[in-house]
Amino acid sequence: EKVKYFIKDALENWGIKYVMLVGGRHGGVGAEKWWCPVRYSNLDDGSDEAQFLTDLYFSDIYRYENGNATFDDWDSNGNGIFAEWKMMKKDNLDMYPDVYVGRLACRNSYEVKKMVEKIITYETTAKGQDWFNRFVGIAGDTYPDDGDPYYEGELATEAAFNYLDGFQADYVWASNGKLSNEGDIISAIDQGCAFLHFSGHGNPMSWATHPPHNGSVWIGIDVTKFPKLSNDGMYPVCIVGGCHNSQFNVSVLNLLKFKNLKTIYYHSTWSPESWGWWMTRKIGGGSIATIANTGYGYGEPGADCLEFRGRYMELQFFKSYSEGKDMLGETHASGLAYYMDKFPPMDDNVDCKIVQQWELLGDPSLKIGGY
């Protein structure tokens, strides 16, 4: 909470707009250790995760009561449990960003150095480059069913591209034969692009989807393949629909929690680093920033797949960019606001979770496309 109070002070006295949190996890077994503090939401939606990471806590400084702004500590019932929502126990939160927050979840000084170099390279070289005119959408049939003609991820990537003027789309889809293995994903990324949109399923180590009407087959990419990415200097902003792709509290040290070893292995929380952060901090390739979920993603199958839940959230980033918001933190925060305008987060705990867990791993002051 000291960090949040410092941000409040800086906002009121220095007029800041952007806050970059630098630091990820650095060990700890019984208790996690962090280079930069984190906040866990205690929203329990009935799934098997009663907590998840949320940096939105650091962005939402004020709540408004009778037109007056007061500090929002995310503990309105005063019981010391932040962002609580479990049955009748519920903290009333504002959740609208007052500053633009992003995180570099670096685990050592070398990662910090390389991320600074990567950001400088992007902002000083991307402008006017041919590769920046590309949009890459990677998807398939997210919820395959023989009687369902809708390929949800493919529809989402197409809808995202429709917000973009002056760009060329490369749809790497299972239905058009361009997505059959991780090599197809690597080849598409290696050509460089402004925006990279995955829409499907995920965990902290991998992202994947299905061919049409075939739920037994998975096509995707995991972190062990990231060393093959070679789009050096042609870094996209990456938007990811799927579960846990930016769950940046993962660690190989979790394998020492022997009592929960089966669950840890199954949920891939033993990954050295999360998929989203690994994509971002990849040297010589990967993304310049990644926006993805720290917890379970939630999607709507079928005809209404773009109108609710996670797919709808994915699209709000592109809507924001289409309106001229090209500073990454503002683009991200505006997308959160658009979602909450349509789905007030205090009315539904899943909508609330979707907003809280939509994490920006990157520099919030980054100018998309460079200077």
Spans of model-derived segments:
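Cysteine-dependent hydrolase recognition
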Residues: 1-371
